Amino acid sequence: MQSFLVAEIQNALRSASVTTGQSIIIEKPTSPKFGDYATNIAFLAAKELKRNPRQLAEELTGHFRFPEGTVTKTEVAGPGFINFFMEPAFIMQSAERVFREGAEYGKGREGQGKTAIVEYVSANPTGPLTIGRGRGGVLGDCIANLAEAQGYHVNREYYFNDAGRQMQILGESVRYRYMELCGRTIDFPDTHYKGGYIGEIAEKIHSEHGEDLLHVESIEPFRSEAESIIFSSIQKTLGRLGIVHDSFFNEHTLYTADLNGISPNQNVIDRLREKGFIGEYDGATWFLTTKLGQEKDKVLIKSSGEPSYRLPDIAYHVTKYARGFDMIINVFGADHIDEYPDVLEALKILGHDTAHVRIAINQFVTTTVNGETVKMSTRKGNADLLDDLIDDVGPDATRLFFIMRSKDSHLNFDVELAKKQSKDNPVFYLQYAHARICSLLRLAWSEIGFDAAKRPEPGVLMRLTTPEELQLAFGILDFGEASRSAFRMLEPQKMVDYMHSIAELFHRFYQECPILKAEPEIAEARLFLAVAVRQVLQNGFRILGISAPESM
């Protein structure tokens, strides 16, 4: 419906010879007395064109040529808002698209014929997944679902950090525990990983090799075994949330030289040097970001010879361009806030267009369990583990709670609320709407022989005229725009909010409008309206990655 209004507004702008660079935004008014939809395009354009906004709004309304039976009236309000009052029969007729399109209803065309890569989770294989990583995983998975809903062919990628100092520390940590099992007394470094899983890996190695590795100086046997076990565990945990990646990019390949003896990391250094953005001082190699107006240069290779995170991240992004993706989406934790702008600047210097690179930063998570906040620390061994949370509240609650607040906001995960079987729990509230519809349709089949799988006759919903029915139909029509908006903002929370509003509208309709006891034609129409809502809920649940129970 919103796309219909946008097209008509664009026609009016052209007809009135008004040229503006402002985007046309359609909103739902706070009160029905202001119409069904509204736009502030006249206000925005007038500011740009230095014109009176109310006069421009009145001029535009004079150029509207809506098809008969679609819009009952338009009115100018306030300083230049244009309100639209829709024809109820048109709303109901439009909502019947759900029956024709089914699971495809609400999908966009923005990404048709295009590819997108969404990188998310990308946790170092140094320990079990924490709750903080879980939030980024669900956020990325939902963003990938939203991209697919807009027509993109999506590649879901995990950047596998299998190189660098942390992997060395992992190997050393396991080796120390192995040596303890061999009877050696070890002063375990405070900088190393102390989780119980380290001891479990050491026990596995000890059971297979005995003391044969005691005098092996290399940590490689310990590192590789730990990496394999931990990464398998990470994939299993993600699978519990329905998160499956299409590809895994190994960081060590960025350190591997090609036939010319140059690694991707070195290639980045060489190309930035050619552009005049590499400096050598204090024993380190620096990205000369002071030339870009920043206060300090950023280290790419430390004095120890170890690359900083920025260098492989730049090289990794170069490979994404080389693979030809039309859109590059990265989902990072809050610890990347200071780093990613430098990566983008380097890519620009290297000649890459960063207009299609999107970044989603998710903030930290704390969990409240019996009124106590649990801290996360993989090295210390008292980690707040994602598996434990899933065990406690289930995968659906875990997913939805991770995205029911803006990614930009710190998330307090209320475990007690996530387990409640009441309307206060947003997961229960959404899924109960679907289960209630399924129960209604089963009852309708047994009592009046209503077949929910049957395609209704065109115009069946036009029999419905009550406010509750119309508001529910309006909600159905907003599904596609909600999905598009959530994708453009990389904000699945917007989709959660929309789904909650649909559930609320349905519950109100269910309470206020008798269904099976209504006149036969009205009963049939209301049942088909419920079928349409069920389809919208299923389509939305698919994006959010939660189940659609038929009974609760």
Curated annotation (Swiss-Prot):
It catalyses: tRNA(Arg) + L-arginine + ATP = L-arginyl-tRNA(Arg) + AMP + diphosphate. It comes from Chlorobium luteolum (strain DSM 273 / BCRC 81028 / 2530) (Pelodictyon luteolum). SMART domains: Arg_tRNA_synt_N (SM01016), DALR_1 (SM00836). Its EC number is 6.1.1.19. InterPro entries: Arg-tRNA-ligase, Arg-tRNA-synth_N, Arg-tRNA-synth_N_sf, ArgRS_core, DALR_anticod-bd, Rossmann-like_a/b/a_fold, tRNAsynth_Ia_anticodon-bd. It comes from the Bacteria. GO terms for biological process: arginyl-tRNA aminoacylation. The keyword Amino-acid biosynthesis does not apply. The gene is argS. One of its GO terms (molecular function) is ATP binding. It is found in: Cytoplasm. HAMAP family: Arg_tRNA_synth. PANTHER family: ARGININE--TRNA LIGASE, CYTOPLASMIC, ARGINYL-TRNA SYNTHETASE. A motif ('HIGH' region) lies at residues 123-133. Keywords: Aminoacyl-tRNA synthetase, ATP-binding, Cytoplasm, Ligase, Nucleotide-binding, Protein biosynthesis. Belongs to the class-I aminoacyl-tRNA synthetase family. This is Arginine--tRNA ligase. The keyword Cytoplasm applies. GO terms for cellular component: cytoplasm. Monomer.
